[in-house]
């Protein structure tokens, strides 16, 4: 079974399942391995959740028209692009020299109680400290690096599924 030959619905369902699996693993790591997510990790989770929603909506709707598939492909690509940006920022924070580190600041729950949403977003994206800690690695890559890999892969998958020319079932 070649997933590149699957229907749009099946391809978008696979994208949804990938996002759901990644979110489930993040929750497992938090609850069972005791790794608390930093604010940038939480924003990456939100981006994966938004991407999952677009993949699921596309899979459930399964538009027949090419324009509809392209819309879902672009929306998913945008969600993945936002996630890529957040993950890239997180990777940058992690690879900075130690002497450039500063505190990440208060927890996200405190920030959301004391600031407006745009201030929270700006504060989190300029934070460093705890966000710079690398507590988990797999094959030499940190979790934000793996998030970046997944965001890139899912962005390309969304574009492929959304823009793939599909043969009509009607023969001329």
From Swiss-Prot:
One of its GO terms (biological process) is protein folding. It is a multi-pass membrane protein. Disulfide bonds join 38-41, 104-131. Residues 29-46, 89-145 are periplasmic. One of its GO terms (molecular function) is electron transfer activity. The chain crosses the membrane at residues 12-28, 47-63, 71-88, 146-164. InterPro entries: DiS_bond_form_DsbB/BdbC, Disulphide_bond_form_DsbB, DsbB, DsbB-like_sf. Its main location: membrane. Pfam families: DsbB. Gene3D superfamilies: DsbB-like. It is found in: Cell inner membrane. Residues 1-11, 64-70, 165-172 are cytoplasmic. The keyword Plastid does not apply. One of its GO terms (cellular component) is plasma membrane. Keywords: Cell inner membrane, Cell membrane, Chaperone, Disulfide bond, Electron transport, Membrane, Oxidoreductase, Redox-active center, Transmembrane, Transmembrane helix, Transport. Belongs to the DsbB family. NCBIfam families: PRK04388.1. Required for disulfide bond formation in some periplasmic proteins. Acts by oxidizing the DsbA protein. This is Disulfide bond formation protein B. It comes from Xanthomonas axonopodis pv. citri (strain 306).
